[in-house]
Amino acid sequence: MENQAHTTAGASPCEAELQELMEQIDIMVSNKKLDWERKMRALETRLDLRDQELANAQTCLDQKGQEVGLLRQKLDSLEKCNLVMTQNYEGQLQTLKAQFSKLTSNFEKLRLHQMKQNQIHRKESSSKEELPFELSSLNQKLEEFRAKSREWDKQEVLYQTHLVSLDAQQKLLSEKCSQFQKQAQNYQTQLNGKKQCAEDSSSEIPRLVCESDPGCEATQRDEFIIEKLKSAVSEIALSRNKLQDENQKLLQELKMYQRQCQAMEAGLSEVKSELQSRDDLLRIIEMERLHLHRELLRMGEVQTAQDNRKRVESSYSPSPKEAERKRKELFPMVSDQPNHEKELSKMRSQLYQEEGLCSEQERLRSEISELTQELHQKEVTIATVMKKAALLERQLKIELEIKERMLAKQQVSDRRYKAVRTENTHLKGMMGDLDPARYLAVDLSNKKHSQCTSINKLEYENERLRSDLAKLHGNGKAAWPNQSSYGEAGAYVFQSQLKTETSGDRISQDCELNRSPTPLSPLPFQTKEMASPLVGDNEVLALSPPDISFRASLAAQHFLMEEERRAKELEKLLNTHIDELQRHTEFTLNKYTKLKQSRHI
């Protein structure tokens, strides 16, 4: 117990020391963390400041680049102007030289001519008075030419001074461009230096971290924190780059949208101008239409007034006798004129009223005649429409009756076909039940006779069905213009008839041979299909009864297979014909309903 107490007493101060050490370590670590955080913040602030400086330097570079571009444009424009000016100056110089050469040649000619004239005038005394006048004119011309040459010299001097000034401007601009380029290079070097400083600061971070606490390099926690800080710094830088890229993209998109808006505004302005021009044209056209309408109304009023005047004149013109009679009657009553003036005015008013009533009656008669003509035309059109409708109804009824008859015939043919099919199936069953031993029985002739009769019945029924089909096809050709399908059906019927004729000949031969008195003779089975041309009569007679029965069963099966195939083909043809008839009936019914609806409308 004492040993245990001693060990616990010895362990307790160690634990206390360890705890103190741990606390001191924690304090140191916290202090280091605080120092690192401060340093990281200081570094981040420095990085932000350097980024701002870089951005400012970049903006300055962009501005300088824009200024350089403007100066280059100015240089190009000045060079173009200089070239144009030099070309103009050279052209003017050439023209001046040409004019000067012409003037010199003319002057020499004039001088020679003057010398000749002087010689002539010296010889002649009469022409001495004219010499001073000509000399004065020549002197005036010389003075004019000298003035022009002085002006040309002045222009030449001005052009030369202008060229010198342009050269000086070009030199100044080239010097400015070189200065701007040097400034741009300086800014670029400054930017590169700042970038290198930033890289050095980012590389100094781990070095400072390592120098701050060389004793805690092995601690994983501090390394993890440092890595986190580095990753955070890199993420911040990446996010800034991304934001800058996004801002550039947004600026480009804004510029693009602004251009599109400008284009749309230009298009809208063009459309508005076009609409305004069209509105103006429409207004002008409307004004012209109104003016023409007014003129037409005025012309109509004038024409109606002229017509009324002509009618009044025509109404008064055919009654001169009555006017004379009235005058004769009124002549003796001149004394009673003041009394009869009122009566005359009343009579005139009555006459005017009667004329107005007559004109109205004529107008009403003309309107009534026009209305009667229109009614008559409408009645005629209604009668024609009713006749057409009645004819269409009759045609539709006839077509419906024909279709009903064809459907009835089709149903009858279907029934017959079903009966023939049942008989064929029954015959198949009978032929399947045949055995070689039963085939050699005594009642073989009766069975064969019954088979022949049933086969004859089937052939007769098939021929009748073919004739019905031919009739139906003929009716279908009359109703439908599609001839290609019916031609194929006719060809198929002709082929089937040929096949039935060949099979009928074969079966008739079998039946005639079956009616012979010997029931077990091998002759009924010597058909064209079974007997080969290389086999003789003795070989056929030497055949055994099982071989004969086997060959007979094969022939019957072959015949039944052909009949089934023909029946299927006939069924297909009938189905197609029924479908065509149904389509035609639907078409006619739709046509009839449309005609009824149009007539009701």
Swiss-Prot record:
GO biological process: cell projection organization; de novo centriole assembly involved in multi-ciliated epithelial cell differentiation; multi-ciliated epithelial cell differentiation
Protein location: Cytoplasm
Highest taxon of source: Eukaryota
UniProt feature coiled coil, ranges: 14-59, 86-196, 226-277, 354-397, 555-586
Primary location: cytoplasm
MF term (GO), any: identical protein binding
Chain positions with Phosphoserine modification: S544
Region (Disordered): 305-329
Keyword vocabulary terms for this entry: Cilium biogenesis/degradation, Coiled coil, Cytoplasm, Phosphoprotein
GO cellular component: cytoplasm; deuterosome
Note: CEP63 and DEUP1 paralogs are both involved in centriole amplification: while CEP63 mediates mother-centriole-dependent centriole duplication, DEUP1 mediates de novo centriole amplification in multiciliated cells.
Function in brief: Key structural component of the deuterosome, a structure that promotes de novo centriole amplification in multiciliated cells. Deuterosome-mediated centriole amplification occurs in terminally differentiated multiciliated cells and can generate more than 100 centrioles. Probably sufficient for the specification and formation of the deuterosome inner core. Interacts with CEP152 and recruits PLK4 to activate centriole biogenesis.
Protein known as: Deuterosome assembly protein 1
Gene: Deup1
